[in-house]
Regions:
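Non-catalytic scaffold segments within catalytic domains of secreted glycoside hydrolases
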Residues: 1-314
């Protein structure tokens, strides 16, 4: 795929379907659930944030130098957007040497509208391959979804943001067996787009707001239009204070129970993450885990939040 224009290539859906067919032939008898594509909307989110970053680059750099916020907290993944933009020239030279092209469109690259559609076509073809071989396997994908909250004069813009993040995917996923919901925080929207975090708001290591209520809000909003099963496939918090992780988990799970009590088909909760992981460009500095890891010895140290989640009962 790297030599065929990558995830923006017209051949990508067929290539992906061929890959899926091979995998299912080998492993299908052992599988009950398959997520074809993780965070199918990530490329569109990165593209929107990068565009905003370009417009605000100088202001953001000045703010960062004086202790202000960066743009990183507006995407639910550990990408250092400033370093990404600064490193584009060096990356182009390296890509040319390794792949023969200046720009490698990997899955988390800034995605065009056409590329976004190719992702959805790839999902549809993959689902067709899976169902043809093993019709009982449950198939879906996951989306990274913010709790989009319109503020004063922000109603129309918030509607547009939700369409980009979720609604325009609906025609392609409405018949899926399930949807994986991945949420970490909320997004406050004004007339011109995303607003800064509220003054005095508690922020996570990822620089977005500590707001565990977001998960319940997103599940309820999604369930209005998607009628398959809902799986919380990612939810958690990057923090060095494990008591805040415990509080986050408690609020998030109470929100799920409320949804289930109201009849929403929420079937699971997968916490992110079991271990303090390597978080994209931010490396090991983001501590999401229920278990800490000493990287010099690889020794695991369970945190109190691990026991709390394991024994949680409303």
């Amino acid at each position: 795929m790297c030599i065929r224009d990558r995830w923006e290539a017209e051949t990508t859906p067929a290539d992906f379907a061929h890959y899926v067919h091979f995998i299912i032939e080998q492993l299908g008898s052992e599988l009950h659930y398959i997520c074809t594509i993780n965070e199918a909307n990530m490329g569109i989110q990165v593209a929107a944030i990068a565009e905003r970053y370009k417009r605000q680059m100088m202001a953001q750099m000045q703010a960062a130098q004086s202790g202000g916020n960066s743009a990183d907290g507006s995407v639910q993944v550990g990408i250092n957007l400033q370093k990404m933009m600064e490193g584009q020239k060096a990356a182009a030279a390296e890509n040319l040497e390794v792949f023969g092209v200046e720009k490698v469109e990997n899955f988390t690259s800034m995605r065009t509208r056409e590329g976004d559609l190719l992702i959805l076509k790839a999902h549809e073809l993959a689902k067709k391959e899976i169902k043809a071989l093993y019709p009982d396997i449950k198939v879906g994908l996951t989306l990274s979804l913010h709790d989009i909250q319109p503020q004063e004069d922000g109603m129309e813009r918030a509607k547009k943001e939700w369409d980009e993040e979720f609604m325009h995917y609906l025609p392609y996923i409405k018949d899926d067996d399930f949807l994986g919901v991945q949420n970490y925080t909320r997004s406050l929207i004004g007339a011109d787009g995303q607003l800064p975090n509220p003054d005095g708001a508690e922020l996570t290591q990822m620089n977005y707001e500590f707001y565990p209520e977001a998960l319940e809000h997103v599940l309820r909003k999604v369930a209005k239009d998607f009628h398959g099963d809902l799986y919380v496939t990612e939810n958690g918090i990057a923090t060095a204070d494990d008591t805040r992780r415990v509080a986050f988990i408690d609020t998030a799970l109470k929100g799920i129970v409320s949804c289930i009590n109201d009849g929403l088909p929420v079937k699971s909760y997968f916490h992110w993450s079991l271990l303090d992981n390597f978080e994209w460009q931010k490396g090991y500095s983001m501590t999401f885990g229920l278990i800490a890891v000493d990287r010099s010895t690889q020794t695991r140290h369970p945190k109190e939040s691990l026991s709390f989640l394991g024994h949680w009962n409303q």
